[in-house]
Regions:
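Structural preference for beta-strand elements that scaffold enzyme active sites
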Residues: 2-6, 46, 106-110, 133-134, ...
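Conserved, mostly hydrophobic/aromatic
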Residues: 8, 39, 92, 131, ...
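Histidine/acidic-residue-rich catalytic or RNA/ligand-binding cores of hydrolases
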Residues: 15-20, 57, 146-149, 196-201, ...
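A metal-dependent hydrolase metal-coordination microenvironment
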Residues: 31-33, 38-122, 140-179, 192-195
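Histidine/acidic residue-rich metal-binding segments in metalloenzymes
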Residues: 119-129, 153-206, 219-233, 256-272
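Mid-to-C-terminal alpha-helical segments outside catalytic/metal-binding sites
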Residues: 290-329
Length: 329
């Protein structure tokens, strides 16, 4: 069985929403696509759990993004602490490997929506101290740091935003994230912002849950140039299982298409640039990989499409582990 590191899921925000509504919310077993039982069945060693925050919804409620994300952090930590023999929080590759040796799963805390920092570096430091080790700059809203590549309707022209780059505050955040050891995640960020990140930084940059724009025209996917740049920097791209990022006009997230994106990225940037970023529990559409327990089916399709066992090991865990070792000291 191939070991799995998944760079992105939205399980915790969904559970937190249920919790706040008085519903049952358990990381051990739930109605989503990721829980501890399924992770063990699927061969996982680490799941990166995003603290996804919807700025639009918070604005309507009059709720502070930073206050909201602190609530998510507390809920996340409570869930992890409830099952100490099964899973443990990690902030380094070494602690992840130690958990694996003890037969435990690992959980890494990540941020999806740089607006939670409210433009204040002290909030970045506070979340770092709580264990955040990966962060996007945006989700689907402009914020104090930068601008997203917006969703587009089918048939709309592909016009990436090459004008509105990172704000001055965003540039300061990127430099500080690299300095203190938070993985810079360019998923959701517009092309101009990604360009700025490559100009400002020196080490690995990742896209935790993005695919190739040439194969699927959604602007959330990466241009060929950005795929190459991530590879040249020693970063990784987590393949996203959502059908809307896999193929134009698709009805179900097909495993075959996931591997086609891998093949394309391999040809542009090399096998070392590919990882997994399921986006599980961040979409409701049909997916052949219906949950974490199905992950070895992806390995079987990779074998069918002529990936070697060594290459599958890299994509499933070793490439992400290499980046963690490089950045998360």
């Amino acid at each position: 069985m191939y070991r799995v590191i998944d760079l992105h899921c939205d399980t915790i925000p969904n559970m937190y929403s249920d919790f706040r509504e008085g519903k049952e919310a358990s990381l051990l077993s739930n109605s989503g696509r990721i829980d501890l039982n399924r992770m063990r069945e699927g061969g996982y060693i680490c799941q990166c759990f995003s603290l996804f925050t919807h700025l639009g919804a918070l604005k309507k409620r009059g709720e502070s993004p930073f206050t909201h994300v602190l609530g998510l952090v507390d809920f996340w930590k409570t869930q992890i602490a409830e099952y100490p023999d099964i899973i443990g929080q990690v902030t380094t590759a070494e602690s992840m490997e130690e958990n694996a040796r003890m037969g435990k799963l690992s959980a890494m805390m990540t941020v999806e929506e740089g607006g939670v920092y409210e433009g204040k570096l002290e909030n970045l430091y506070a979340l770092y101290d709580k264990g955040v080790r990966m962060s996007t700059l945006t989700w689907n809203f402009a914020n104090e740091l930068g601008y997203p590549n917006p969703a587009i309707a089918p048939g709309s022209p592909r016009i990436p935003d090459m004008v509105n780059g990172l704000t001055d505050t965003g540039k300061s955040f990127v430099e500080e994230m690299e300095r203190i050891g938070i993985l810079i995640d360019v998923s959701h960020l517009n092309d101009a912002g990604i360009r700025d990140i490559f100009e400002l930084t020196h080490g690995p940059v990742i896209a935790s849950h993005s695919n190739a724009r040439t194969l699927c025209s959604h602007l959330r996917n990466l241009s060929d140039n950005n795929i190459r740049m991530i590879g040249e920097r020693g970063g990784v791209i987590g393949i996203n299982y959502f059908v809307g990022f896999l193929e134009d006009g698709g009805k179900i997230g097909r495993i075959e298409k996931m591997v086609e994106h891998m093949q394309y990225i391999k040809n542009l940037a090399g096998i070392d640039a590919i990882a997994l970023g399921s986006d599980f529990d961040g979409f409701g559409e049909l997916c052949e990989l219906s949950g974490a327990e199905k992950m070895q089916q992806l390995a079987a399709e990779m074998e069918r499409q002529s990936f070697s066992s060594a290459e599958i090991d890299k994509v499933f865990s070793l490439n992400a582990l290499r980046v963690f070792q490089s950045v998360l000291s």
